[in-house]
Amino acid sequence: LLMNLAKYYAANPQEYSIGFICFAGEEAGLVGSHYFTENPLVSLKKVRFLLNTDLAGTGEEGITVVNATEYPREFSMLNAVNDEHKLLAKINPRGKAANSDHYFFSEKAVPAFFFYTLGGIKAYHDVFDKPETLPLNEHEDLFKLIIHFNKKLMGD
């Protein structure tokens, strides 16, 4: 998903900067994202919104959005985009949680959502969690949701 988004934005430049970053050490305690937020390459005050797409699997049953209750305006925008384009089955709100790389950004006052997909295979971080068993059924719709949400968020 991240590579497809990067490819899309490289081919479709925006009037604002979009950064893509991958972190290591999540399972060891969000080490990479914690380090980055303590030693940012750009001022965190310049980050308008962070989207974390960790756990972007099948999505047959929709997505859950961590920090939805922290940013109700943006969550409402996301739902409006989904309703307009009829992309995902549902979008569930969730509150603040220290469960992925968005967390330390949120703690530094950077607005952030963490999307994780629902449904599909049950393997998660075990020997059965392999690329060939992950069908990515809603990958395209999640991709479109992010593109449309970014446009709405940035006022396009």
Locations of regions flagged by a protein language model:
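His/Asp/Glu-rich mid-to-C-terminal helical/loop segments that flank catalytic regions of hydrolases
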Residues: K7, A11, I18, K122-D156
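Alpha-helical metal-binding/catalytic segments enriched in His/Glu/Asp
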Residues: L1-L30, I146
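Sec/Tat-exported extracytoplasmic proteins
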Residues: A6-P13, C22, P40, N82-K86, ...
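Short, surface-exposed linear patches
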Residues: L1, L41-K45, Y71-F75, L134-E138, ...
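Predominant activation on well-ordered alpha-helical scaffold segments within soluble catalytic domains
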Residues: M3-K7, H34-T37, N79, F143, ...
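Generic alpha-helical secondary structure signal
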Residues: L5, N12-P13, P40, F75, ...
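Metal-dependent peptidase/peptidase-like ectodomains
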Residues: A24-A123
